[in-house]
Amino acid sequence: MSLSSNHLSHRSIFACILFLFLTPLFCAAQTPATADASPTNSSQVKSVITQMRVRMRSVPLDVVVEALTGHKVLHFNPDNPNHAEVLKRLNLAAADVAAKIKAAGGITNKRVNEVGNIIEDYVRAAMTARGMTATVPTGEKTGKARVAGYPDVAFAFNGERFYLDCKTHDKSTLKSTQRTFYLSPSDDPKISCDAVHFILSFETSRNGDTYQLVRYKIVSLEKLSLDLKYEFNSDNRRLYSGKNGSEVLSDAACE
């Protein structure tokens, strides 16, 4: 199978999955719980859930993004002068971030996730200082800045727009197969245009609660291989209220 036909196959499969799985579940969830609707929708939902046992693996990021947002993940072309200059400036910005954090004595925080959030602020400031106007991406529908979710940074250079996600990693986890990249459907996607997508990831070293930056990687994500994991979830309100299908059997104080 050729690359183009394989790409088309991924696109077709993913579009079918979205249609077959997500649409019926959404419709069933929106239907009032009336006597005439319940049996049919129950069967429909069970059928869809059965199909969800089929796992989707190794779907390229560009296929997923276009299916979810309608926007393309563009190819990073090192022979494109604008792309080459962006990469050069990203390297300079990454070095600036490392130097500033080192001069500050590192980042001290008990929560490693917060370390990543702090680094994001350094990255946006350094990129902007290097001539790449970097901001928090805005939702395509609302136009409001959205911090949570992929990607972390939207930036522009010479009239071309780009996206970048900031990450941290430990040297010992580089070959880990645990999930570290997430992309979810949204009614207000942060991806609002065709663009090249990057990751800037800093390797960290830790001494107590203080983190230093050791090295960095810049990665182009166009063909990043993604797996799709289906997940059902709930929350404390539904778990412990005795409503929404749960039944509290005991609720007593400990002596």
Predicted regions and their residues:
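N-terminal secretory signal peptides that target proteins for export/translocation
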Residues: 1-10
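Domain-level recognition of nuclease-like catalytic cores that cleave nucleotide substrates
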Residues: 196-254
